[in-house]
């Protein structure tokens, strides 16, 4: 990886991390669903006039938008609003990888291999450690935690829709997909 690529990768990590801080601050002034809706409106509304609708079946676009754009962020914003620490939410949200593997096995008949099963076991152990107050010393409201897991599951469902979308097109316009799916909420 070149130095430029490394700096760009670091920038992505910083922006991603700041996203959770901005959510936390924004929730002090606005209800969670309104903040989430505003977030997507600010992305989608001006961009749809410049970016063509992706050439994918409407049902897949709607499914992707409902899971990635609406449900994931509705659950996440509500979780943080109900007391889930933003930093912890960013970690728990990564359970989407576990959910994606499991959904991929059920949806596409993908086979799970030893390394994947070991990763799943490690992920479940990590989630259990995060839940256990005596192990991490941080009180987490169970409702916030469960809403964050629901957000992770929604993200995983979106990943499944994304895989289906990719199979319908030889070269889908990813930016177009993201922008137009943001209209769904």
What residue ranges belong to the model's regions?
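Specific transmembrane alpha-helical segments of multi-pass solute transporters/efflux pumps
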Residues: 14-15, 19-20, 48-93, 101, ...
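Small-residue-rich packing faces within the transmembrane alpha-helices of Major Facilitator Superfamily
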Residues: 17, 37, 41-45, 124, ...
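A helix-boundary/kink motif common to multi-pass secondary transporters
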Residues: 31-32, 84-85, 108-113, 170-173
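Hydrophobic/aromatic residues within transmembrane alpha-helices
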Residues: 26, 35, 79, 106-108, ...
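Transmembrane alpha-helical segments that form core, pore/gating elements
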Residues: 44-47, 100-101, 106, 137-185
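Hydrophobic transmembrane alpha-helices of multi-pass small-molecule transport proteins
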Residues: 41, 47, 64, 102-103, ...
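Loop-to-transmembrane alpha-helix entry segments
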Residues: 56-62, 90-93, 109-129, 138-145
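Glycine-/small-residue-enriched transmembrane alpha-helix faces in small-molecule transporters
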Residues: 1-34, 139-164, 185
């Amino acid at each position: 990886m070149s130095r430029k690529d490394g700096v760009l990768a670091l920038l992505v990590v910083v922006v991603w991390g700041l996203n959770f801080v901005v959510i936390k601050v924004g929730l002090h002034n606005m209800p969670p669903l309104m903040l989430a809706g505003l977030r997507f409106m600010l992305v989608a509304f001006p961009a749809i006039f410049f970016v063509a609708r992706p050439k994918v079946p409407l049902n897949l676009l709607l499914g992707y938008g409902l899971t990635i754009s609406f449900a994931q962020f509705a659950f996440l914003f509500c979780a943080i609003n109900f007391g889930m620490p933003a930093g912890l939410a960013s970690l728990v949200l990564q359970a989407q990888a576990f959910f994606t593997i499991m959904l991929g096995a059920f949806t596409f008949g993908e086979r799970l291999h030893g390394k994947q099963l070991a990763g799943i076991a490690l992920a479940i152990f990590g989630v259990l450690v995060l839940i256990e107050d005596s192990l991490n010393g941080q009180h987490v409201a169970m409702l916030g935690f469960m809403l964050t897991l629901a957000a992770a599951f929604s993200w995983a469902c979106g990943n499944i829709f994304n895989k289906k979308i990719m199979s319908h097109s030889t070269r889908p316009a990813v930016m177009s997909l993201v922008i137009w799916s943001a209209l769904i909420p």
